[in-house]
Amino acid sequence: EEELAPATEAFLSSFKGFRILSEQPLVIEWYTDAYELDAENNVYTMWPAYAGGEAPWHSLAVANLGVLNGELAYTYSKADADGVEWADFISGPSLDILSNSLDKALRTDEIPYLPTLYQYISEEEAAERYANLRNFYANYGHFWVGTGPYYLAGAYKAESVAVLTNYPAYPDEASRWDWLVER
C-alpha cells in the first residue's frame, strides 16, 4: 500500500536483519544501522503490532486473507484507490468480509507465512485460535481482540463511545507498574 511505503523505506534503509538464537527462552538478535542517543530507545520489540496497537496473529491473518482476496485494504487511500473496504475491525461492512475470511481460515487451518511459522504454529493451534476468534466475534460483534487487561465489550461509533471491560484472567497484577508512579 503506497501510503505505507515511506515508513517502510525508512525502516529498510537501516534494518539489516534478525536471528533467533533460542526459543526457550526466546532470544533474538536484531541488526540495524539506526541508533538513538538514549540507550533505552535502542531496544526493539519483536511483538507483532500495527498502527492501532498490538494484535494476535490470527486476527491479522484473517484480515490478510481479505486483503489478498481484493476485498479489504489496510489504509484509507488504498481502499479508495481500489474501491474496496477499509479493514475496520470494529464496525461497518468490513466485518462481513472479515467473517467470510475467518470462515476460509477455519476451513483450511490457515497458517500465515507458512514456510516460517509452520515451525511454531500447528494446524491444531490455528484451528483453535480461529474457533476462539469466531466465538469472540459471535459474543462481541467485532474483531478487535486485545492483548491487555481490558477488552472492547462494545463500540458505538455514532456516539463516540467504547465500552472496555476488565479481563480478569490477564496475567499481570495491577501493582506491576506501581514503580512507575511518582510518590
Please give the residue ranges for each predicted region.
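Glycine-rich loops and low-complexity Gly/Arg-rich segments
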Residues: 55-56, 176-178
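Surface-exposed binding/hinge segments that line
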Residues: 2-125, 147-149, 156-161, 165
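Polar/charged alpha-helical tracts
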Residues: 119, 124-132, 178
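C-terminal substrate/ligand-recognition segments
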Residues: 130-177, 183
